[in-house]
Amino acid sequence: MALEMTQRQGIVVWLYSLRQVKQLRRYGLVYYTSKRMKYVYLYVDADQAPAVIERLKKLHYVKRVTRSQRPMLDMEFGALAELANQETATKAALKE
């Protein structure tokens, strides 16, 4: 029996009040709650994300719902580190 990884999607739910945070648990895993900015970060299955977003938008205590952009970002930073090292080397050479 092999354990399969399910794809997850992060959803940011902006609220009018934080009283309903417990109610959001039925839609997904509440990962983080910001009391100051009044938002909740949820994780849901990627295949269920569009349906969950539509259900969340219909709730009266939800201000807005946005998807996390992290899956769309390129997480390879090796080339950027090399570029930064080259820039610092050229700046050091110019100072001398």
Curated annotation (Swiss-Prot):
The keyword Cytoplasm applies. Belongs to the UPF0298 family. The keyword Cytoplasm applies. This is UPF0298 protein LCA_1075. It is found in: Cytoplasm. HAMAP family: UPF0298 (MF_01126). It comes from Latilactobacillus sakei subsp. sakei (strain 23K). InterPro entries: DUF2129. Pfam families: DUF2129 (PF09902). Keywords: Cytoplasm. GO terms for cellular component: cytoplasm.
